[in-house]
């Protein structure tokens, strides 16, 4: 197997906390020219979906954002990753591990009131 070389061409910073009562955004940035990009996609699943759902983005100024409304699609957690395919056939993804394998992010959707109550208790 060829050795993986990490090239930071696709960037995503997971949010620290996601709430089950508020719309949140999953955003990815890419360092590729829009002329080189064939498709940018988010793949996500929740505890209510056993398979990943693909959300293809429209090309727009290197900013790709997906809004998730937990009130419309209730879930306990969301697992996701992003892919970028180029016109030359190359494929990139984020997040990946040191071997280049996709390592999806899993974030639990928390109750905001309970989260801030526990956080306040920790400060006291």
Specify the residue positions occupied by each region the protein language model found.
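Glycan-association/targeting regions that enable binding to alpha-glucans and other polysaccharides
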Residues: 1-124
């Amino acid at each position: 197997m060829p050795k993986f070389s990490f090239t930071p061409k696709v960037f995503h910073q997971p949010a620290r906390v996601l709430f089950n009562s508020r719309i949140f955004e999953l955003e990815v940035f890419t360092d590729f020219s829009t002329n080189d990009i064939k498709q940018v996609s988010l793949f996500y699943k929740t505890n209510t979906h056993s398979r990943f759902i693909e959300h293809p983005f429209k090309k727009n100024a290197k900013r790709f954002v997906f809004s998730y409304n937990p009130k419309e699609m209730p879930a306990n957690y969301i697992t996701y990753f992003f892919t970028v395919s180029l016109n030359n056939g190359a494929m990139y993804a984020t997040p990946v591990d040191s071997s280049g394998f996709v390592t999806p992010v899993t974030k639990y959707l928390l109750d905001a009131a309970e989260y801030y109550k526990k956080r306040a208790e920790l400060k006291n």
